[in-house]
Amino acid sequence: MIRYIFIFSLFVAQLHGQTYKAVLYNGTGAGSQEKLLAMTLAGIVNRDSARLYLLNVYETWSYNQTDEKWRDIYRSYGNVQFDSVQIVSQLIDKFREYIQGGISYDPNRYYSNFSGQNFRWQAEQAAMIGGLCNRLPVTSAMATLYNLPLSDSVLITDSFNDDSPVWVTGKVDNPTHPWNNTSLNEEARYLTLLNWGVQNILPLCNPSKFYIREITDWTVSQKMFQVNLAGTDGLDLNSMSVSKADILENVLTYLNTKNSDRIFHIYGWIQPEPMTQWFAFFGSSFHETLLGNLSFHSSFQVEQQYFIPKSKVDPDTVEPDNKYYIIFLGSEGDAANWVVGFQSGAWFSADRGKVPVGWGWNLHLFDECPFLAKYYYDTGTQNDGFLSVTSPLGYAYPDLWSGAVLQNAIDTTKYLMNRFGVDNIYGYKHYAGAGMMTYRGKTISNSFNFQKYGQFQKAIDAKLTMLFDPQLPTQIPITGYQALMFNHTGDGSFYGTATNLTEMANRIITNIKKQTKPGFLIAGYQRFRQDNASISSADITMPRLIQVVNLIKADPIVGMDVEVVTPEMFSVLMRKKLGLLNTREDENIPVGFALHQNYPNPFNPETVIRYQLPVSSKVTLGIYDILGKEVTKLVDKEQEAGRYQVTFDASKLASGVYICRIIAGDFVKTIKMSLVK
């Protein structure tokens, strides 16, 4: 039996139904320099509380009403009262107490990695440096206009390693800097600055998070090291120049060293996309986050809770019938553009809930931004199935992680699955053109290492792993790799054409007829869009999906036996058919004692500690400082056999390493936890 112990953290204003006040900056019509300043400001002031919301500063490309919708939801659902501002000088004045001055840059320094991109490289680095010392990126003229003093050098305090403060440039545009050597071309100048940053700025930045591409408020708030590097092609790994790849590898190697026994996270985007596999070899997980306001979403605190989708299925209440069970899955679930962007607006369809759908989510982003999770869980219906894409830890490849980080990856994955009530996963690899290639000493493949992948899925207790892989049989259950897998490939169900709905329905009907009852079919892995969107050939809307379902059910041969289900129902029925599910899953007793690594770690200010008992025991769970002095006792009582979780709130403690120790009968274990403020 699973039991949860919570220490609740709740805004007093929300607890008593009072209004929560924040500032809204309306960036509609603002220039790129003003927007960069506003994003940097938001990143600085939103670190410990949600103070500044950005409207139309850096909105999701997938749904252009994302900022407006979340603004309205915060007003009605979060009881937020926004003080709206559109003039930058007024915005700065509202938060001047938080700002130490400016970091100057040359606004005429542009660079592009590929056709269609163009960014101010000095400005982005000024924003990153400014975020580390609470200063805003400005030109010399802006510094005068907004009364933001400049300094030749600024002192940066290391928030993560307790190292001595370091002086760095306060003027990125200083002509004496090597990256301002006018004899160099623009790329050489930018890469010179990045290489300087790797040596001087990276050690001062967040050792567990890294950002690639255009800088955002999230980058600043988390004090990440940032680079804006990409290849010229979306898929060709060799389109990334050697000099750029060298910089990335130097950063990844450093982060791997700092996180030798745990996963670190990369945010932003990478082109070519197969580099996400290369990143995984260094022990990372990736997250597409090309959008603003994550600093606000992550800092808007809600009651610490565990979530159960309304689509959750009690295995004891259902049995497979003489039917064909089919599912439609929403793609892009790992990407913030879909997680934050309301599934590209499809979440607001009046037809959502009329037919079962499997919505993909990034559980790591949910954990970082629990208000978002709470909204989706509260507004979901029984027909809104939830699954994790491509891993609960994000856009990740568990089969590529080394043994050193595996236990942490398993522990954090199980925590995320447990917190969000999601135990079905969709994974894929499909970006190595030749099927397999070697890139900088690492093997990039179109297929998983099924033995390693299956071992990981078993370790996290994934109930069903759906995947797209060219090497596995299609549309049949696979149990030969220690975990239940179900693949779909080569039948038009992966980003299949949805332009002609009759043709789409006929394609699915043809695939259904290949099944024997009770049969199971992934009918479509499609990109869902808002109802009135201008859609591409692989996109679908809820009204169009309903038309497809009606066409399938109208088929005179199989139509009457087709049932569209959620991933949760699909998983339970398949396991019932295979004899893999015979007892209540939530009554399983652990086979041994365990104290798992806390998550998140490092943390600020809360972290969750999980432990398990195979028999009833007297449990003492305490927190100690590095000298062994007890800080607090979280548990001190008899507990029955089961799995437990407790939240440790360190908001009143100083940054540093703390020890968690459990004593349960003869079982004693400790873990180290890092509080970083």
Q: PLM features: what roles do these ranges have?
A:
Residues 2-13:
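Sec-dependent N-terminal signal peptides
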Residues 360-423:
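Substrate-binding cleft of extracellular glycoside hydrolase catalytic domains
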